[in-house]
């Protein structure tokens, strides 16, 4: 049946004239072939879980937040070591450095690096000098520590070990000068004395506190002798 509107804009056609559409879509059967190994893994997993051994299948994931840099793991603070080096090389109070941090906040890696550096420039083909310098550093610091405790000083062995190690820096500074002017005996001797006084003053000003009072020379003198011995290991005297 067909209707024609008066305005002629639309034409309506009955649905009986349209063809009916029908059909089916064949979907192939899809099977996942995981292989025999997958079946064995599934069976093993089920077997372990049924027997109460499921915890063997758990994988622990390491948290990245717990990982720390290597320097932090070894307790190495490069900024702190650099500041202590400046305190030792410039011991004058007028420069404004908080020099007591070398004594009150001792560390091991900084002094060890200084001692090893002094040992390396002292080798001159004699590798046994390295072990001698490290031995003198350890036992010389122990002697200064015991003497300081006997005199009533409130210092620890770690503090003495750090101060004595860092105070080797003046001897490292004068080492290149001795290589250049080694032929001038008078000038070379003056530089050696200056280096020893520099190192001894830097160490003594950190270790010898007000608690020693009139006993200061009793501790300053062995410190001075210790750095003379260090210098003798370098020069081969």
Curated annotation (Swiss-Prot):
Pfam families: Yip1 (PF04893). The chain crosses the membrane at residues 107-127, 132-152, 161-181, 189-209, 217-237. It is a multi-pass membrane protein. InterPro entries: Yip1/4-like (IPR045231), Yip1_dom (IPR006977). Residues 128-131, 182-188 are lumenal. One of its GO terms (cellular component) is membrane. It is found in: Golgi apparatus, cis-Golgi network membrane. Keywords: Golgi apparatus, Membrane, Transmembrane, Transmembrane helix. Coiled coil: none annotated. GO terms for biological process: endoplasmic reticulum to Golgi vesicle-mediated transport; vesicle fusion with Golgi apparatus. Residues 1-106, 153-160, 210-216 are cytoplasmic. Belongs to the YIP1 family. Involved in the maintenance of the Golgi structure. This is Protein YIPF4. The gene is yipf4.
């Amino acid at each position: 049946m067909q209707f024609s509107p008066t305005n002629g804009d639309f034409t309506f056609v009955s649905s009986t004239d349209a063809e009916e559409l029908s059909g089916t879509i064949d979907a192939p059967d899809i099977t996942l072939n995981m292989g025999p190994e997958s079946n064995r893994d599934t069976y093993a997993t089920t077997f372990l879980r049924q027997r109460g051994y499921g915890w063997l299948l758990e994988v622990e994931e390491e948290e990245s937040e717990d990982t720390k840099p290597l320097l932090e793991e070894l307790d190495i603070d490069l900024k702190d070591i650099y500041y202590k080096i400046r305190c030792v090389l410039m011991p004058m109070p007028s420069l404004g450095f908080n020099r007591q941090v070398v004594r009150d906040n001792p560390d091991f890696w900084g002094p060890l690096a200084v001692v090893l550096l002094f040992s390396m420039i002292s080798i001159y083909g004699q590798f046994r000098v390295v072990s001698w310098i490290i031995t003198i550093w350890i036992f010389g610091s122990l002697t200064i520590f015991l003497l300081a405790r006997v005199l009533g000083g409130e210092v620890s062995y770690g503090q003495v070990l750090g101060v004595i190690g860092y105070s080797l820096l003046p001897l490292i500074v004068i080492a290149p000068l001795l290589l250049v002017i080694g032929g001038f005996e008078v000038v070379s001797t003056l530089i050696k004395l200056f280096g020893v006084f520099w190192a001894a003053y830097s160490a003594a000003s950190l270790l010898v506190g007000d608690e020693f009072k009139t006993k200061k020379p009793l501790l300053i003198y062995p410190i001075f002798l210790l750095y003379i011995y260090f210098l003798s290991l370098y020069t081969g005297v």
